[in-house]
């Protein structure tokens, strides 16, 4: 469960890092399934935008009860998973994710959504760990994004 302080942090800052670690055996299963996916779809080496479309077995990991409880504490009990993506972050990958608002990519209104990010690779500044602009969610509106055709980006839009 998220603490009251963690929920307040999410409400104020727009993100929270829970005290949770996926069990090692589950991480190993995710890595094995990802390896199998890449054998069939090598084009997803850096990014797979809709992994459940290509391998429904990943849904098992999206149903983790602890993670679902965290989401329920943030959004309430009426929520749905509508997408699951895979961003590879091995060392010296060369693919960057530009600053963006997740809601710009999601056709969901109102913007009552959240992202659950589970790091499988070590998340460090050197390989592109997630960074957030504290409080940027409080405006509750999307900034316009422009298309960027740079092939070294995992996402093609940025403000």
Briefly describe each language-model feature range.
Residues 35, 40, 121, 152-155:
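Juxtamembrane helix-loop transition sites at the ends of transmembrane segments
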Residues 125-159:
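Double-stranded beta-helix
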